Regions:
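Long hydrophobic segments that form regular secondary structure
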Residues: 35-36, 41
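A contiguous, basic/glycine-rich beta-loop/short-helix subdomain that forms a polymer-engagement track
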Residues: 21-33
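Rhodanese-like catalytic fold shared by cysteine-dependent sulfurtransferases
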Residues: 1-22, 39, 50-235
Length: 235
C-alpha cells in the first residue's frame, strides 16, 4: 500500500523510529493533553478497540483500532504526515502505537494520555459516546420503521450485496459523501465487521453529527438476520 510517508521519505526527511519514540512517548496528564490539543491543533487518535471506545472517549477523537488494519487506515484518514497527533491507547501499547505510526511516516506525535480515558473522566472532563447495537437489534428496529442506513464498505463489497434501501458512503472517501448523512434522522452505520464503521462514526461525530448508531458485526452479522438484502453475488 502507498502511504503518505513515501513522499517525505523521497525527500530524505524521515527521522529514525528511535528518534521519534524519544520525542513522542511522552505521558501527558489530562490538563496538559487538553492544552496541547488546543494549542497545537492536534488530532486525537484513539487506538483502542471499538467495543471499548464506544463507551467513552475524548470529544472529537478519531478511533482507528491498533488491532485491525491500523497503518493503512491511518494513511487513508490522515493524509498529512505532519499533522500533530495525540494518542489515547490501551495501557502498555503506547510504544507499539508510536512505533507503527513512525514506520509509515507519522513522526509528529506530541504525547499520549497518561492514565487513559479513566484519568480523563476522573479529571471531570467531558466524555463522548457512540451507541453500538447488535445486528439482531438492528433487524428489530428496521421492522418497526424505515431506518437511514449508511454502508461504509468499499464499492466492490457494496456491489456484491447490501441492505435494501441503504445509502453508500465508502469510508476512504467519507468526506466526499457527507451529503449521504441525514442531518435529522438517526444514521445507522455499518461496514463488513465493525472496524471501519467505528472509524466512520468517530469522524462523523467529530464533525458534529451526533445522531449515529453503529452496528456491531457489520454486514457479516446483518446478512445472518432476516434484514432484506440485495442478491449476494458471492459469499
Amino acid at each position: 500500500a502507498y502511504f503518505p510517508q513515501n513522499v517525505a521519505m523521497n525527500k530524505g526527511v524521515i527521522p529514525s523510529v528511535d528518534e521519534v519514540k524519544q520525542k513522542s512517548l511522552r505521558p501527558l496528564p489530562p490538563e496538559d493533553f487538553e492544552h496541547i490539543a488546543e494549542a497545537e491543533g492536534a488530532l486525537v487518535l484513539d487506538t483502542r478497540n471499538a467495543e471499548v471506545f464506544k463507551d467513552g472517549f475524548v470529544p472529537r477523537s478519531i478511533n482507528i483500532g491498533l488491532k485491525g488494519d491500523f497503518a493503512p487506515w491511518v494513511g487513508a484518514m490522515i493524509p498529512d504526515v505532519r499533522q500533530p497527533l495525540l494518542v489515547v491507547a490501551d495501557q502498555g501499547t503506547e510504544d507499539e502505537v508510536v512505533t507503527r505510526l513512525a514506520r509509515v511516516g507519522y513522526d509528529n506525535v506530541l504525547g499520549f494520555l497518561q492514565g487513559g480515558i479513566d484519568a480523563w473522566r476522573a479529571s471531570g472532563r467531558e466524555v463522548d459516546t457512540i451507541e453500538r447495537i447488535d445486528a439482531e437489534e438492528f433487524a428489530a428496529r428496521l421492522k418497526q420503521a424505515p431506518l437511514h442506513v449508511v454502508d461504509v464498505r468499499k464499492d466492490g463489497e457494496w456491489e456484491n450485496g447490501h441492505v435494501q434501501g441503504a445509502h453508500h458512503a465508502s469510508l476512504q472517501y467519507i468526506n466526499d459523501h457527507l451529503h449521504v448523512i441525514a442531518p435529522e434522522a438517526t444514521n445507522y452505520l455499518h461496514c463488513a465487521g465493525g472496524y471501519r464503521s467505528m472509524i466512520a462514526a468517530s469522524i462523523l461525530k467529530a464533525r458534529g453529527h451526533h445522531n449515529l448508531v453503529e452496528v456491531r458485526g457489520g454486514f457479516n452479522a446483518i446478512k445472518k438476520t432476516d434484514v432484506p438484502v440485495t442478491a449476494l453475488m458471492c459469499e
